[in-house]
Amino acid sequence: MVNMIDTGNTAWVLLCTALVFFMTPCLALFYGGMARSKNVLGTIMQSFFLIGVISVEFILIGYTLIFGDDLHGIIGDFSKFGLGGAETTILSDTHIPELAFIAFQCMFAVITPAIMSGSVTGRMRFAPFVVFALLWSIFIYNPMAHWIWGGGFLSDLGALDFAGGLAIHVLSGVSGLTLCMLLGRRRGYGRMPMLPHHLPMTILGAAILWFGWFGFNAGSALGVGFLAANAVLTTQISAAVGIVGWVLVEMIHRGKPTVLGAASGGVSGLVAITPAAGFVTPMAAIIIGFIGAIVCYLAVAIIKNRLGYDDSLDAFGIHGVGGTWGAIATGLWATTTINPDGANGLFYGGSLLGPQLLSLVIAYLFAVVGTFILFKIVSAFMDMRVSIGSESLGIDISEHGEGAYNQSEFKSSGRFISSNQTSLL
């Protein structure tokens, strides 16, 4: 059996697994820097704690629900419950141990609900968020991932998603938007400044996210070769032009280039190329990343303000909108010259755009309806939102009993006392 393993492909997938794992704590830094100082630890904790919870969920039932034998195109069966039989299985197409594939996919499952947390920063209690994220992963992410990657009905319709533009970014972004609207806006939103408290932390998080994204996209080739190389290059190009596109529009609109804008533009470009990285040419990636940054900027800087919803850290504005554009762009620029197992987009004489648009409609509907139902179920048993006093004090102290900065003393009750605990930031 050992002789059947492609050691090069296996090493590549294991390396990319480590890179993708690194993305979740870096997402925590990216979000943490954008949060107010009284909420930074709570924001980081919402992402970091999910590494533990969702990893266990995925190993026990998530993997089999996604990649188990298909049941009517809807969900996988329980044939792989608890990874049954995977210990000695080698995937026939890539000749890697199934355990390596499981580890890689586990990192995707972990980061998806963590992205969603950016929509509710500063106002959702920790325990209900964890319960909601766990249920969301089981009943929303797992079915959607099966529909796309596990032999479900969307893949049968011909929809393509190379590394998670639909299953990860659109799903988490739209669910985040739904969740933030159900929770309501932060108190004082629109009336007092709610500025990022630590932009160096955000730019560091964005930079390391970029590094990890090479594993995210190129690792989805599940082996070394032309496809992985193309994914690395398209990822780099799209992120690079994303920075340029966002900052240019920002200068036109607001008159000054910002560090936050550069970080947001880079991430927008990364999100936009995610579904397309293994299907489009590097030249197409330039267009995809540039337009992706522009549409994300419009969503974050203009549409959100006009509609008045409080997507705290723009999970929908960047991931939902960027993923939507990326899925459409795949339907336009995908070519079998890059990936013979893919399909030709509209600009190459193919009919891929139709399945891509249909899959987007289904993803949006499923995310909105599913998130609404799960929110109502969890809120029937738990208070989802922090109290007025706790929100004013900050979730770091009220939910976790600690503060990120200027710690001075703890009372016997364990409540943290800090000189800056009433800061607006």
Residue ranges of predicted features:
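Glycine- and aromatic-enriched membrane alpha-helices
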Residues: 1-425
